[in-house]
Amino acid sequence: MAGQKIRIRLKAYDHEAIDASARKIVETVTRTGARVVGPVPLPTEKNVYAVIRSPHKYKDSREHFEMRTHKRLIDILDPTPKTVDALMRIDLPASVDVNIQ
């Protein structure tokens, strides 16, 4: 698989879980002999929701909730078959969304 590239995108709400998962992927890939670029932090997506506190009136009184989505990008250059096998077997938390291209 010379000259090829694997791109891994990670998404999670918890920044500690995504950083630990990225660290685990980088350690696994470097152990198998492939080159790694990253993890590159991508912009954090922030969704803010305003909810009326009262069930009936007082529309001016609102409560704000936010949800942050953290993203990381990892590129694996010149992956070996051993690298691909190790990536398939890696155990990551369920809270981290992994997209492999």
Swiss-Prot record:
Entry keyword rRNA-binding: no
One annotated GO molecular function: tRNA binding
Keyword Ribosomal protein: yes
Keywords attached to this entry: Ribonucleoprotein, Ribosomal protein
Pfam families for this protein: Ribosomal_S10 (PF00338)
An annotated GO BP: translation
Gene Ontology annotations for the cellular component aspect, listed alphabetically: ribonucleoprotein complex; ribosome
Stated name of the protein: Small ribosomal subunit protein uS10
